[in-house]
Regions:
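Flexible, glycine-rich loop/tail regions that form catalytic "lids" or insertion modules at the edges
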Residues: 1-73, 307-319, 334, 341-342, ...
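Short glycine-rich or small-residue beta-strand-to-loop segments that form or flank ligand, phosphate
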Residues: 140-146, 195-201, 324-331, 367-368, ...
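Active-site phosphate/pyrophosphate-binding segments
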Residues: 219-405, 426, 502-509, 515-538
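Conserved active-site and cofactor/substrate-binding residues in soluble primary-metabolism enzymes
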Residues: 7, 33, 53, 57, ...
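Helicase-primase coupling helices
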Residues: 363, 367-464
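Extended, charge-enriched "interface" segments that sit outside catalytic cores
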Residues: 3-8, 15-28, 32-135, 140, ...
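Glycine-rich phosphate-binding loops that contact phosphosugars or nucleotide phosphates
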Residues: 121-129, 135-299, 507
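C-terminal accessory domains/tails appended to large, multi-domain proteins
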Residues: 452-455, 462-488, 493, 500, ...
């Protein structure tokens, strides 16, 4: 385990072992101020972690870890621009995109301000009708072409903050499967459709393929040559490559190597957000994230929301044995949050070696999954309540949910709070026996109604889903991910594991096209390739 000194690790191990025989609800009896004491508040968010299997002594030991592992200093290194991405010898300054520690980076801050100014001007020009398509019709739809960080973040934000009065309707295409693009474009009009092509190198296979096919769709709709540029925006470092699609330099926006893809929605990657929701909403999103940055920089470990979130995951994963973490947002607006967090956490912390190449002896990131409530209640909550797997969870509840049927929103909140209680209390054996007898089962068969409970989870309350609170929520998870990486002794800013599949896919292209029948590959894969070739022989 990366935790030092060893005595601290041993103390946590012993505390976890002692707590296994205790009930979470019993801790409320022994800790009178538990409800108010086990919470953090920041930027419109409240983290209530009182329903974790954790007592004061164990919590204090965990908080000591934040000092011994120098988490505050690690955050100062992050926002200060030190080389935290050691394998690629780069800083990770996504916080600078929202104005955090801008005084420490005057040159980079100037570049960001210039880019934001250009973005705002283009958005205003399109919304006002000054910039139109080739036939002088105003744009009605914007299609974001990207994958990974250039898709998941903007998609989450646009879905969460969408209103029927949005200036442009946003669409997202990431999959190389042509059904994704074709299905998206089917109801759209080429004359009123704008594309944002997001690729740092303009060589990402999925994005390049979709961009070429999208341009073909525009051409089939009568938009040719230089006129294509009116319908295209590129977020890339490769301006010369963009020009071959007739995208003028003023419609190309930069990406910097000190911003990783999964942290990039705050950059020009967020153009689809601004185009769909308006520049003010995008700026408010940045402001919310900045507020959370300021909280993270200044709050003590006891009250530091992302720091506590990271320590809780360390506690659950490494000391209480939780091997998955489920995120359950009780807001349809946040349905894409688990997808976004999967990339953020598992691509960042799904590592097995240290930055110096040492094989780690401890687990790193847990598997993260989830969906919007109450959908999950009718699919996998059965496993959560009565399965054999150990897990931890975040239940997310906005207090104010906007317009709509008040009774339905009350019911949604009731389900959220019920699922915040049920995993903790469960259904004891005696209650299960009584229920079984009432339903005509004998005592032995009545065990199927028992639910052990005692599952730890956090309740994360949002005042409402607004640009500010959503920006803060995303930033909180970003910083949690970074702090956990520091605790685990790994680099969260590279992703070498993504490359192997890409390399093999390149070989498979030659096999599937019939250009290389002598490639060395296992028989099962070659048999599947031959089946595909036979099915697509025409």
């Amino acid at each position: 385990m990366a935790i030092t000194p060893t005595a601290l690790h041993d103390a946590l191990t012993q505390a976890a072992e002692a707590l296994r025989s205790q009930r979470i609800e019993g801790l409320f009896d022994t800790t009178p101020d538990r409800t108010s004491g086990y919470r953090c508040e920041a930027a419109g968010l409240t983290l209530d972690y009182s329903k974790h299997l954790l007592h004061d002594s164990a919590r204090q030991t965990l908080l000591t870890v934040s000092d011994t592992q120098a988490l505050p200093a690690a955050f100062a290194s992050l926002i200060g621009g030190e080389i935290v991405n050691t394998s690629e010898h780069r800083p990770a300054l996504h916080t600078l995109l929202r104005g955090t520690a801008s005084d420490q980076h005057p040159e980079k801050s100037k570049e960001i301000e210039e880019t934001l100014s250009r973005m705002a001007a283009l958005v205003e020009s399109i919304h006002s009708g000054a910039s139109t398509g080739d036939t002088d019709k105003r744009f009605t739809d914007v299609v974001n072409l990207g994958i990974g960080g250039s898709d998941l973040g903007p998609r989450l934000v646009c879905e969460a903050l969408h209103t029927h009065a949005a200036p442009l309707k946003a669409h997202f295409v990431a999959n190389i499967d042509p059904d994704d693009l074709d299905g998206t474009l089917a109801p759209l009009n080429p004359e009123t459709t704008l594309f944002v092509i997001c690729s740092k190198s303009l060589s990402t296979e999925e994005t390049l393929s979709n961009a070429e096919r999208a341009i073909g769709w525009l051409q089939a709709g009568g938009i040719q040559g230089q006129a294509l540029g009116a319908h295209l925006i590129a977020v890339t470092t490769q301006v010369a490559k963009a020009e071959r699609w007739h995208i003028p330099p003023e419609r190309c926006f930069p990406l910097w190597d000190w911003v990783g893809g999964r942290y990039s929605l705050w950059s020009a990657i967020g153009l689809s957000i601004a185009l769909s929701l308006g520049w003010q909403s995008f700026q408010r999103l940045l402001d919310g994230a900045h507020s959370l940055d300021m909280h993270t920089e200044s709050a003590s470990p006891t009250h530091n929301m992302p720091m506590v979130m990271a320590l809780l995951e360390l506690w659950q994963t490494h000391y209480l044995g939780a091997n998955t973490h489920v995120v359950l947002p009780y807001a349809q607006k946040l349905a894409h949050l688990p997808d976004f967090l999967q990339q953020l956490t598992m691509e960042s912390n799904g590592k097995r070696v240290s930055p110096t190449g040492e094989l780690l002896e401890h687990d790193t990131a847990p598997v993260l999954w989830g969906s919007a409530g109450t959908i999950g209640q009718h699919s996998y909550y059965q496993l959560l309540h009565q399965g054999t797997r150990s897990f931890s969870a975040d239940i997310i509840l906005p207090l104010r949910s906007g317009e709509g049927d008040r009774d339905a929103r009350r019911a949604l909140a009731a389900h959220a709070l019920a699922q915040s209680r049920a995993p903790m209390v469960g259904r004891p054996a005696e209650q299960a026996r009584q229920l079984g007898v009432e339903r005509g089962f004998d005592e032995s068969a009545s065990q199927q109604f028992e639910m052990p409970g005692n599952h730890s989870h956090s309740l994360l309350i949002m005042d409402a889903v607004t640009p500010e609170s959503l920006g803060a929520l995303i930033a909180a998870y970003e910083h949690k991910t970074y702090f956990l990486a520091v605790l685990l002794g790994i680099n969260p800013f590279d992703q070498w594991g993504v490359e192997l599949g890409k390399v093999i896919a390149g070989h498979m292209q030659t096999v599937l096209s019939g250009d290389d029948s002598n490639v060395e590959m296992d028989a099962a894969t070659l048999a599947a390739a031959e089946a595909w070739r036979a099915a697509n022989a025409d």
